[in-house]
A protein has these predicted regions:
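Positively charged n-region of N-terminal signal peptides that target proteins for export
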Residues: 1-5
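A short beta-strand-turn-helix
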Residues: 100-118
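C-terminal cap of thioredoxin/glutaredoxin-like
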Residues: 20-51, 55-70, 188-250
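Bacterial N-terminal signal peptides
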Residues: 6-15
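A short, surface-exposed interaction/processing loop segment used at functional sites
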Residues: 66-93
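Structural alpha/beta surface segment adjacent to cysteine/selenocysteine redox centers
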Residues: 116-126, 132-196, 212-217, 237-238, ...
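C-terminal low-complexity, charged extensions that often adopt amphipathic alpha-helices
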Residues: 93-98, 142
Length: 250
């Protein structure tokens, strides 16, 4: 499974390099919309700069005469992409961990132990059949403390999705209401309140905005921090290998 590459533009909070300290060629690239984050020393005595453009990490390299800058990847003699490593280490991985903290702080429907080997956040729609299948598949893992699941309900698949989501969240025991709904294949409907509390409406809207910010275009959208502390993403029903990785938190 590939490491999830998050939309980083909203998460880069550290100060960026001041334009006045940049060589003229790098300043010209900055004027084209590349945000320069920090300098770094590249192999071979080459000066490099780390940046981002529209949420994607980029590396720039200054020629020895200081008159030209090259945007792209640097490889070593063994074919290793050295640029990709610094982009991952300095941008994607820290941004992923920052996003994971946000996901952990969000209210949701929790199932399983806080001591489980792998903590999982899943965005789900009440009318999503793949979400239901995933919920059923992970129940044994939840029961044996391999996983804990926090479900963030969204309302995107049907006009009544939001109504069902808010009714489940408004229940006296949202976790039980969700479990009953999923276990019954959606036949055990939640009790619908006369009106949706504003806080629940805002929560569902926030869930949807967060899912979109993460780049997910469908449900279930599954996230977890693996044993290497890398944020992982699965969109849709996990295949056999993805389920094995999830169960092992790798």
């Amino acid at each position: 499974m590939k490491t999830f590459r998050i939309l980083i533009s909203a998460l880069l909070l550290s100060s960026t390099t001041q334009a006045a300290t940049l060589p003229a060629p790098v300043q010209q690239i900055e004027k084209q919309g590349v945000e320069i984050i920090k300098p770094f020393k590249a192999p071979g005595g080459v000066q490099g700069w780390l940046g981002q453009y529209q949420g994607t990490g980029v590396t720039l390299y200054l020629t020895p005469d200081g008159q030209h800058a090259i945007s792209g990847y640097m490889y070593d003699a063994q074919g290793n992409n050295l640029s990709e490593k610094i982009i991952n280490d300095e941008i994607y991985l820290p941004a992923g961990r920052a996003m994971w903290k946000q996901l952990q702080a969000m209210p949701g429907i929790k199932e399983g132990s806080a001591e489980a080997r792998c903590q999982v956040v899943v965005f789900a729609d009440p009318f999503c059949p793949y979400c239901r299948t995933f919920w059923q598949q992970v129940q044994p893992l939840v029961q044996n403390n391999a996983l804990s699941i926090k479900t963030q309900l969204v309302g995107i698949l049907k006009p009544e999705s939001g109504r069902y989501a808010s009714a489940i969240l408004a229940a006296a025991d949202p976790a039980k209401a969700w479990q009953d709904f999923e276990r019954s294949q959606g036949k055990n409907k939640p009790a619908f309140p006369d009106s949706t509390p504003r806080a629940l409406f805002d929560q569902i809207q926030h869930n949807q905005a967060q899912m979109q910010a993460l780049g997910a275009n469908g449900t279930p959208a599954i996230y977890y921090l693996n044993h290497e502390q890398k944020l992982q993403q699965i969109v849709g029903l996990p295949d056999k290998q993805q389920m094995a990785d999830l169960a092992a938190c790798r």
